[in-house]
């Protein structure tokens, strides 16, 4: 099976609109602002699912997963696969917590290989990407390119701290034909949870960011 092409992925991406928060902006930043660290889901990109429980409800009746399973020749029902997916994630979390990690992050590719029985990591990555598009549709927040361009022009150091998997950084390429670094994010200020095996609210990601900012005089 060939790897997913960006054009194939883009055909499945649909526009989304953000929901109003119902909150009134207040407070003011203290100048000068020298760095901005963003989250991804719900900040840079609109996320339709919101959280894992919402994703479970969203997927439970979706025919998209059944189609995906047939495409990858997996002779199981969507319900069975979803049950095994969430059980595998919870088991991985529990095992890691026993080693003293309070807020673990899973390797979703390894999880999918175990759940689906796919024989290679590349096939499991393709499956993970397609599942994510079905389970958690995303779309850039309004005016995102304008905001990033403004911060770049003002020499504001931009970074990301996000609960994420390997496909999260790919969002920038899918929508903007650029990696995060190409849009002005500093490579040393990209803190994706899957790279650390730790998820927010673990202080590990924030402490790593603070260390880099201190070392570079920001």
What is the meaning of each model-derived region?
Residues 2-9, 14-15, 20-83:
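Active-site neighborhood of HAD-like aspartate-dependent phosphohydrolases
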Residues 30-31, 121-123, 151-153, 181-187, ...:
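Short helix-terminating capping/connector loops at secondary-structure junctions
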Residues 48-60, 98-102, 169-177:
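Short, flexible/disordered intra-domain loops and linkers
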Residues 63-129:
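A metal-dependent, Asp-based hydrolase signature
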Residues 64, 143, 205:
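Charged catalytic carboxylate motif
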Residues 66-70, 145-149, 153, 211:
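Surface-exposed alpha-helical segments enriched in charged/polar residues
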Residues 101-110, 118-121, 132-160, 168:
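Short, acidic loop-to-helix structural element flanking the phosphoryl-transfer center
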Residues 139, 159-161, 165-218:
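Substrate-recognition "cap/lid" segment bordering the active-site pocket of phosphatases
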